[in-house]
Amino acid sequence: MPQAIGGVARPSPAAETWQRFRRHKLAVASTAVLALMLVAVAFGPLLWRVPINDIDFSAHLEGPSRSHPFGTDDLGQDLLARMLYGGRISLAVGLAAMLVAIIVGTTIGAIAGMAHGSVDAALMWLTDLFLSLPPLPLLLLIIYLFRQPLKQLVGPEFGTFILIVAVIGGFRWMQVARLVRAQFLSLREKEFVEAARALGMSSLRLVTRHILPNSLGPIIVAGTIDVAAAIIAESTLSFLGLGFPPDIPTWGRILFDAKDYLDIAPHWALFAGGGIFLAVLSINFIGDGLRDALDPRTSS
């Protein structure tokens, strides 16, 4: 709610943040693009009711047309239907992996930032250990070892989803932990925190009421970066054949299937690669805009 100072209404912090975000034209445009993609993958299959696994060899490798706006693959399957279905999975993996990374990283960073001595040192040693590990070989190894047991336990699609989200999120929390720890180390010495501590407020309430809310800006920005990184990681795993099963058309899997037909059916790879490119680019620009909006010192 606007505050009146000296007879002049001052915008609320949320309004000021929105005004700074609107100045970042690429971030605003990227928000519109990402929102359009989310609406398309969420509601598109309800309007475009072509089954994703319908095979029509008479229409194989067709280019874009009225009946198949994105063309078809080598089995004559409609690429628009498969892109809409796969977009749900790719974006869901990105968002879920981001939540895992944010929750784990924020928890570890908060404990390290509030603790002293051996606890802080041990958690930072653990963070440095994970940062030193080569992520891609370990991703491949973990998925190779645990994919089949999880498939048998909860089914091929959900089991693969859980495994990929856990693995990607498990290798993205370290940067968040370091960022949160630095914020906590800075904020815990501020006057308003010292005043609350002097009034007898417990450490848990200090964190939840004062320190964590003032650290949300950098955490949100880190979350947007993690979404983009998770989408790329899932697409990479699917392209290498270690992601979802072949009958589940994620964007990375569609790109993998298109690699042998680049010369005769370039539209196949173009739409899959374009979906990944637009999603990742939009999220990165949104992250830039949020960084400038949430931290006025970085905005020009």
Regions found by a protein language model. Give the residues of each.
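Gly/Trp-centered helix-boundary motif
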Residues: 1-106, 110-111, 118, 132, ...
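Generic hydrophobic transmembrane alpha-helix motif, especially the helices
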Residues: 69, 79, 103-104, 113-114, ...
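Amphipathic cytosolic juxtamembrane alpha-helices at the membrane-cytosol interface
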Residues: 77-92, 96, 112, 116-124, ...
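Residue-level hotspots within pore-lining transmembrane alpha-helices
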Residues: 88, 130, 134, 171-174, ...
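Short alpha-helical transmembrane interface motifs in multi-pass membrane proteins
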Residues: 89-93, 108, 124, 162-166, ...
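Hydrophobic alpha-helical interface/terminus motif in multipass membrane transporters
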Residues: 111-112, 142, 146, 180, ...
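Helix-loop interface residues and adjacent transmembrane-helix termini in multi-pass membrane transporters
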Residues: 114-118, 158, 224, 239, ...
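Non-cytoplasmic
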Residues: 137-141, 145, 165, 169, ...
